[in-house]
Amino acid sequence: MIQHAIAKLLEGEDLSRAEAAQVMTEIADGGATPAQSGAFLAALRMKGETVEEIAGAADVMRQRADRVRVSRDVFIDTCGTGGDGRHTFNISTTAAFVAAGAGVCVAKHGNRAVSSRSGSADVLAALGVNVDADKETVERCIEEVGIGFLFAVRLHPAFKAIAGVRRELGVRTIFNLLGPLANPAGARHQVLGVYEARWVPVLGGVLAALGAAHAFVVHGEGLDEIAVTGMTHVCEVKDGAVERYTIRPEDLGLPRRDAAELAGGDAAANARIVTHVLEGQQGGPRDAVLANAAAALVCAGAATDLRDGVARAARSIDSGAAREKLRQLVAATTVPA
């Protein structure tokens, strides 16, 4: 199948959802050589990935994931694509703790750094979370603490082999888009930041095709986040309906911030910023977290709109609830000496 798919792509033809799924299955099963896998990824990138192709690939990623069981009906993910190259601190990871502190169950999917110096796994490890905790521990964290970290590299074993091909290619491929679409717990409520604005409507369409209950796909001022520095492009998906619009910080009741305020560093530096935000320090990092946590609360049904979400997120921080969720997650994932 993969040879047929490569030929189609080189002719500029789109694959159907089923065809894309067949190719991904072949790659996952080891039926494709590294050369074939690389040619497929490059040809697909050159043609441009469609909603159907991404949905078909995501179907297989979801099926092959090591499933994490969650008993709650509503739980969220704040995993973005990464790769925006802006080197901010870990905004969506911090927002996950704020959402948890506001009473929302969080199954946070994430990985090591893509283009930044600190991915979600890196900063969580620096904060004291055992990101390599086994699946049973992760499930217990989600149930008892209300937040758990789903480490992508551990929970998508079928696609370990493709990692070398991706590294050797050295360019973005469909896999840069698939991570946030393949939460191993099956989250149907999520905030998904993308590294380029052109992917906002595309991934909105993909989430609708995959049956998302309520989700926001966002890109703001070059960030795979809701921006407090300017305009954010949004695609909101709710029970099959898709709505596109833009928002500005003022719409959320937040001041406009300078991008330099959101700059991050390595995992240790970012961990300090996360800690300062959760301790209630005012400034650009807090406002960025409030904006993104607000969207998480809305998609979980815990806030009526983004302004209400900002107010509830602020209470989560200022009451100490968000900081307590981090403390509890560290304790729950730490093996006693």
Swiss-Prot record:
Keyword Metal-binding: yes
EC number(s) on file: 2.4.2.18
Keywords in alphabetical order: Amino-acid biosynthesis, Aromatic amino acid biosynthesis, Glycosyltransferase, Magnesium, Metal-binding, Transferase, Tryptophan biosynthesis
Enzyme class (EC, first level): transferase
GO MF term set: anthranilate phosphoribosyltransferase activity; magnesium ion binding
Pathway this chain belongs to: Amino-acid biosynthesis; L-tryptophan biosynthesis; L-tryptophan from chorismate: step 2/5
Example of a GO cellular component annotation carried by this entry: cytosol
Role played: Catalyzes the transfer of the phosphoribosyl group of 5-phosphorylribose-1-pyrophosphate (PRPP) to anthranilate to yield N-(5'-phosphoribosyl)-anthranilate (PRA).
Family annotation (NCBIfam families): trpD (TIGR01245)
Name of the protein described by the UniProt record: Anthranilate phosphoribosyltransferase
Source organism of the structure: Anaeromyxobacter dehalogenans (strain 2CP-C)
